Amino acid sequence: MGSLLRMNRLLSSIVESCNCIIDPQLPADDLLMKYQYISDFFIALAYFSIPVELIYFVKKSAVFPYRWVLVQFGAFIVLCGATHLINLWTFNMHTRNVAIVMTTPKALTALVSCITALMLVHIIPDLLSVKTRELFLKKKAAQLDREMGIIRTQEETGRHVRMLTHEIRSTLDRHTILKTTLVELGRTLALEECALWMPTRTGLELQLSYTLRHQNPVGLTVPIQLPVINQVFGTNHVVKISPNSPVARLRPAGKYMPGEVVAVRVPLLHLSNFQINDWPELSTKRYALMVLMLPSDSARQWHVHELELVEVVADQVAVALSHAAILEESMRARDLLMEQNVALDLARREAEMAVRARNDFLAVMNHEMRTPMHAIIALSSLLQETDLTPEQRLMVETILKSSNLLATLINDVLDLSRLEDGSLQLDIGTFNLHALFREVHSLIKPIASVKKLFVTLSLSSDLPEYVIGDEKRLMQILLNVVGNAVKFSKEGNVSISAFVAKSDSLRDPRAPEFFAVPSENHFYLRVQIKDTGIGITPQDIPNLFSKFTQSQALATTNSGGTGLGLAICKRFVNLMEGHIWIESEGLGKGSTAIFIIKLGIPGRANESKLPFVTKLPANHTQMSFQGLKVLVMDENGVSRMVTKGLLTHLGCDVTTVGSRDECLRVVTHEHKVVIMDVSMQGIDCYEVAVVIHERFGKRHGRPLIVALTGNTDRVTKENCMRVGMDGVILKPVSVYKMRSVLSELLEHGVVLES
């Protein structure tokens, strides 16, 4: 009340000071008038303070978009306050000036109020939209919160997947993989039980193979045709199943409701190509079944991210199992391969031992058979040159011919043996091809004339005279093939033709593997031997190049089989990068043997260096060996006697010794030739040759050294040449052969017989 009295006195003083005219018609209730004065004063005060506050906060805000609207509101409020302040004087009489002052703010207030009202029509929707945007942003923020929750859940799921994948793939043992999967799933998802059912080998049942808590006996089986199993196997997603289904009844019954159960299939690798002992044969069903159970004492349910985690883990388990299966198969294959390698290594060693044993046997047989054959042939040849009755001469010739045939057979066996084990190599050199054909013709012609067969030789004009190849093996092929033609022909003729094979004649449909490639450095020689003999049936032709075969036609003629000849010829032709075959129109129509071999062409730069001249038959019978001093060293008494008999028959003065020391003690400058058997047991005959070289020095002052051996291998020949021997003679030796060797040795100072 005191404040009102003070306000009343203040207003009274204001009225008195302004000389206001009080309307005498106003109500006389002074108390009401005082309250109106007080109200207008405070309204004006509020109106003046509100704009100040607006201006203050707008200046503090940098983002408010409606500053000019606030200016209008401020003006409107200030003017409203001014009108209320002016109303303090309206209760008394006032002058015209006061009326003008009162009217002006009211007019301005009216104007600003109308403008502000009009502007609010446009501003209010924006203000409402701000509220709408606020609600939208709140909704968006809530959605972002949910998405962030999903992302966090996915990250958590991904972390668990990575962790589980790492644990699963940390091993390639399938038992460890499956046990680790159950343990990690149980720990990550807080499961009460987790089990894996595997198909049996028959594929008709699922067998309980692994469990998490180990409370259930492993080995339980359920039929694979159960509806719940078909439902799970029919999709690659997790399927919720009843806790009472046969595959889920794995936990003991309790007072709580069982938790939710889900199942998912686990694809298994198709094992048709793998034979793993305890893995099922998967023909129709290729899945295992994984069952996962939530705890029974909670109201927990499966979430989407948990189901996705289970699906991903099932796929990872499938991949890990496939890797484990492949690893197991690889290990099994490795073990099997190791066993096979051990067996192969054992077989290889046995084969090598067999080859060595065979070679040793052949070497011994070669030496041991050539030594008695040397005596037979040498003595037979000596008898042949004595005065004999016709009957005796026929018997001696038969013995000599049979012995030579046996020697040829031994050579063929040794050649075939070396061909089969790959130890035989061609002796490549330059030789006169024309002279070789003429020599073969001169050797075959006397044999054919006995059977009244005509042998003709035809060499084409473009055939090179000098070629590069194995002269000895080519002659062996020709003698074998031409010899067979003469052997199986009773009458008619045998023709030999040789020419350079053209490109169109190199291909043979019977041998598609033979592919000839001519070049400037070599050519292909084609040789055809045609006879008018008994002929061959088509079905017998493929067997002719087999060892010791005999066709039906040959059996009826009592001519014998082809022996090893053609088989060896085929091997020689193959070594010469060629091809051999036989053509015949049938029995009684003759046959044609054809072979193609590859020969080199000597370079023009080397043509002037060729030391070869056409070989003419040497007239060894004209050379005299009377008084020629020869020393023979051989431990075999029979062989010593035979060799001495041959040399004595030729007129030589022969001294024989049986040991190394005796040979070195006896040999002198008077001895022109030393013949030694290099196959003597326990004696290094090569050392004897070295000592003779050292003792007598120069070649013209020492005797010529010749090796007499039954060994036909290349090593023996190379060893003889290495120690400086002047020649090699192969047993057996006839009188004619010994005369030829001595003549060549004395004439040229060297003799080599391969």
From Swiss-Prot:
Cofactor note (record): Binds 1 copper ion per dimer.
Protein name, entry field: Ethylene receptor 1
Organism of derivation: Solanum lycopersicum (Tomato)
Gene Ontology, cellular component aspect: endoplasmic reticulum; endoplasmic reticulum membrane
Predominant cellular place of this UniProt entry's protein: endoplasmic reticulum
Swiss-Prot/TrEMBL cofactor(s): Cu cation
Biological role stated in the UniProt entry: May act early in the ethylene signal transduction pathway, possibly as an ethylene receptor, or as a regulator of the pathway.
Every Response regulatory domain range: 629-746
Subcellular localization: Endoplasmic reticulum membrane
Family membership: Belongs to the ethylene receptor family.
Induction of the gene: Constitutively expressed and accumulation not affected by ethylene, silver ions or auxin.
List of residues binding Cu cation: 80, 84
One function term, GO molecular function aspect: ethylene binding
PTM per Swiss-Prot/TrEMBL: Activation probably requires a transfer of a phosphate group between a His in the transmitter domain and an Asp of the receiver domain.
Record domain GAF: where: 173-321
Membrane topology recorded in Swiss-Prot or TrEMBL: Multi-pass membrane protein
UniProt-listed Pfam families: ETR1_N, GAF, HATPase_c, HisKA, Response_reg
Quaternary organization: Homodimer; disulfide-linked.
Positions carrying 4-aspartylphosphate: 677
Residues the record lists as Phosphohistidine modifications: 367
The protein's enzyme class: transferase
Enzyme Commission number, as recorded: 2.7.13.3
Transmembrane spans: 38-58, 68-88, 108-128
GO biological process, one term: negative regulation of ethylene-activated signaling pathway
Gene that encodes the chain: ETR1
